[in-house]
A protein has these predicted regions:
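N-terminal intrinsically disordered, cationic/polar leader segments
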Residues: 1-7
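Hydrophobic core residues within well-ordered beta-strands of beta-rich domains
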Residues: 7, 67, 83, 108-112, ...
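Catalytic strand-loop segment that frames the active site of acyl-thioester-processing enzymes
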Residues: 7-38
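Short structured motifs
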Residues: 7-12, 69-74, 97-99
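A short, structured loop/turn motif at beta-sheet edges
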Residues: 15-20, 76-82, 117-122
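Hot-dog-fold acyl-thioester-processing enzymes
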Residues: 30-51, 63-64
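Hydrophobic beta-strand-centered segment that forms part of the acyl-chain substrate-binding groove
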Residues: 54-93
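HotDog/MaoC-like acyl-thioester-processing domains
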Residues: 90-143
Length: 143
C-alpha cells in the first residue's frame, strides 16, 4: 500500500495494476464535513488523483504535460464510511483515444468519468475529470 498523504487526509493507493488504480480514504476527522460525512472536496480529490495517476502510468512526465482543466462532480449519496475509487484505462484506450489524436493535434482534452463508492458499495459520487494532454515539444510557455 502506498501512502500519498500521511497527513492530514490518509489517502492510500491500495492497488496499482497495468490498467487500473484504486485509492481509498477513511472517514476520519480531517476528512469530514460539518455533518460528519466525508467532505465533497475530498471526494473530488480522489477522482482527480485516480485519473491523474493513471495517466502518469501511461505518459512520461518528461514527454507530456498533463494539466487539469475542469472537475464536475455529481453527488448521489452521503459518505459515512471509508470510500474508494477504482479508475481503469487500457493501453489500447490510451492509443486510440489520446495518442492517435496527438499525432495530428498539439493537445487533446480528454474527459474521464470516475465513480466513488463506500464500503457498502453505495455509489457516492461521479466526477467528470477533464485533462489537457500535450507533448512538451508543443508547449509554448516553458516552465
Amino acid at each position: 500500500m502506498l501512502r500519498l498523504a500521511t497527513r492530514p487526509h490518509n489517502i492510500n493507493v491500495t492497488h496499482i495494476g497495468d490498467n487500473e488504480i484504486t485509492i481509498c480514504a477513511k472517514n476520519i476527522k480531517s476528512n469530514r464535513n460539518h455533518i460528519k460525512g466525508i467532505h465533497a472536496c475530498l471526494l473530488a480529490t480522489l477522482c482527480e488523483y485516480a485519473s491523474g495517476l493513471s495517466l502518469l502510468i501511461h505518459f512520461s512526465p518528461k514527454e507530456y504535460r498533463i494539466i487539469l482543466k475542469t472537475i464536475h462532480m455529481t453527488y448521489h449519496y452521503q459518505a459515512k464510511t471509508a470510500v474508494y475509487v477504482t479508475f481503469k484505462i487500457t493501453k489500447q484506450q490510451i492509443e486510440e483515444e489520446i495518442l492517435n489524436h496527438l499525432k495530428t493535434q498539439d493537445a487533446i482534452f480528454k474527459e474521464f468519468s470516475v465513480e466513488v463508492y463506500d464500503e457498502e458499495k453505495n455509489h457516492i459520487c461521479t466526477g467528470l475529470i477533464n485533462w489537457q494532454i500535450k507533448a512538451w515539444k508543443n508547449v509554448k510557455m516553458k516552465v
